Amino acid sequence: MKKVLFVVNNSAFFASHRLPVAQQLIEKGYEVHLASPGAKLAIFDEMGLSYHKLKLSRKGMNPLSEIRIIWQLFKLFTDLQPDIVHMVTIKPYLYGGIAAKMAKVPAVVSAVSGLGVVFIAAGFKVKFLRVLLYPLYKLAFSHKNQVVIFQNSDDSVFLINWLSIHPSKVRLIRGSGVNLTAYQYSIEPTGKLVITFVARLLADKGIREFIDASQIIHSNGIEVDFWVVGDLDEGNPASITKEEMASWKKFPNVKIIGFQNNVADLYSKSNIACLPSYREGLPKSLIEAAACGRAVVTTDVPGCRDAIESNETGMLVPIKNAVALADAIEYLIENPDVRTRMGTAGRALAEKEFAIEKIVAEHMKIYRKLLDQAEL
């Protein structure tokens, strides 16, 4: 029985973004393992997935601690002897890629779901950090039997050029997919319009611009509600503070809902989806909104623009521009026929490009090819 080991930095993220892939592997007779920090979820036992607890901090930068993570992964790989290691998010694919090289893992999948703050931010410190990270990235992406999955073409072009990754290693898979049965198309609700933001409450998700746009629209005398669906991420330096979030609750047109599992239900009660992020891999919340038939307003940045068809399923606005964001939202508020047209087109896009069955099938094809190459 072939073994596949997933390495991710958050078990809840794995459950929300990769579980269908793992389930398909199990159904096909693979032995599937997950290594991650955080809680072991009940669903893992229910589906027959083996869980390995990692000591991994998403944001820690202590050199000794980071070296220990590589050693920890090396030990896990040598003890478990997986046929494929599939690593998702930055630290797993960086440190796991190095450990997999050391442990001579037969096949490696490195899933780049976004480049992170090191490649978003500017300034001397960030540029210096990139120089330090270059040899680690170079090593992590140098496995002879490896596939690197990107969610958008901007990220793939950047890393291919920066690291001289051979194009034969690269695959483009647009996001983690959406369950079209769970996220069904619905007509817009009647009554006061609702504009919904679904994401962690991080500055680089554009939450401040979303709140600012809500107040611009309120000052224009337009009575609509703005829903904020997501929690603080206090271990993340980009997280909004509790005090700032509390201040938003004073605005009459803003409703802080917090993290929710019933996103499909929330979209069914909404009219417009909005994510003014600074950069993404490919945001799951936007493809879920499309599946539900909601027009989207998002930023013209990598990942976000890949989740929509501009002026067909949604509208693109400049980054960090609350005025432009408010203008786009206001346009959709005032044009229900445009919202309906975009929502219908969004559902069609989700069915064509983002169906979970399509995404899972693309992963299975990658695994089969890697296993075949490992046996040569």
Where are the language model's segments positioned?
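Conserved acidic donor-binding segment of nucleotide-sugar-dependent glycosyltransferases
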Residues: E309-N311, M315-A322, Y331-D337
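A short, well-ordered alpha-helix in the C-terminal region of glycosyltransferases
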Residues: A324, Y331, V338-E353, I359-K365
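Donor nucleotide-sugar binding/catalytic pocket of nucleotide-sugar-dependent glycosyltransferases
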Residues: H52, Y134-Y185, F197
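Aromatic "clamp/platform" in nucleotide-sugar-dependent glycosyltransferases that forms part
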Residues: F259, Y278
